[in-house]
Amino acid sequence: MVDTYQVYLARHYGADAVLLMLSVLNDEEYKALEEAAHSLNMGILTEVSNEEELHRAVQLGAKVIGINNRNLRDLTTDLNRTKALAPTIRKLAPNATVISESGIYTHQQVRDLAEYADGFLIGSSLMAEDNLELAVRKVTLGENKVCGLTHPDDAAKAYQAGAVFGGLIFVEKSKRAVDFESARLTMSGAPLNYVGVFQNHDVDDVASIVTSLGLKAVQLHGQEDQEYVNLLKTELPVGVEIWKAYGVADTKPSLLADNIDRHLLDAQVGAQTGGTGHVFDWSLIGNPSQIMLAGGLSPENAQQAAKLGCLGLDLNSGVESAPGKKDSQKLQAAFRAIRNY
């Protein structure tokens, strides 16, 4: 903004705050816009991009200072700018709220900057998403999944807690197994991205269930090999992800190379992988960038697990009161722990 008219116009259209860029405003212009905003009970985000502007913001008494990570000359971004400037703001204006702006796309970036900033201004990366609610969850909490959903009420509990994905287990021997109709009813409980869990199923059966229910991903929990995965890929609707689960005992398993969107590592106890309630040695994870972490996750260890940098956590038995019965208090506690950074 460069003119007080814009402030009044913004308020007319329902804005609660304005962003004032010290890179384009001198002190006199800033004060005029500040006065107009305050007369309308509007907040002000004062944007700085270098040390000089930072000192001006402090001298002007800015209460909320945004650090723009974008170079306005060539439009490149550098998140280290927040790390470089925030300590000076803390020193000179300890009561100011620090906001990191621009170039923020992932939850890991948010976690990395959390010790420097009190909040984040995120625009294009969120607005490009079809589902804004789930997009915000992904960047603030990570792409976490609550598996073993068997009832619409449990889907609602998972969604309310902060989950992005909901897991539906189509494995008959599982204590949390669902059939097609119960899966459909469960999905009616909340607008999660639903993942179907299968184990050595016929490819055509998997594709049929996925297509009919509109699932977002397939999680393979059996001995499915690369040939199986390649065939399944050709049968699934475009955009449906394939996740491969691996049991981890005392060594990291070999991961399939092609057509896998996410690798899920779960604790293996004897011949059983998944649903054991056990935690494996997390030092075996390796590169976490494509990993969903499962196995014995609960409110007690969710915060520590979230620090590992995985794509997301897969919660199940640790947030239940009984197999297939999700506990609202445990879910809320687990996601509070994840959010504690």
Which residue ranges define each predicted feature?
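Active-site beta-loop-alpha junctions enriched in small/polar residues
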Residues: 1, 23, 49-51, 70-72, ...
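Ordered, small/hydrophobic-rich secondary-structure cores
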Residues: 4, 21, 29-128, 281, ...
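Glycine-rich phosphate-binding active-site loops on the catalytic face of alpha/beta enzymes
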Residues: 6-29, 66-76, 116-139, 163-175, ...
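N-terminal active-site wall of soluble small-molecule enzyme domains
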Residues: 1-45, 53, 82-85, 167-235
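Glycine/Thr-rich beta-alpha phosphate-binding loop at enzyme active sites
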Residues: 57-90, 167-174, 248, 258-292, ...
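Catalytic cores of alpha/beta
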Residues: 2-13, 49-60, 100-122, 150-161, ...
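Hydrophobic faces of well-ordered beta-strands that scaffold small-molecule active sites
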Residues: 18-20, 44-46, 65-67, 98-101, ...
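C-terminal helical cap(s) of enzyme catalytic domains, especially alpha/beta-barrels
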Residues: 79-88, 114, 126-147, 180-189, ...
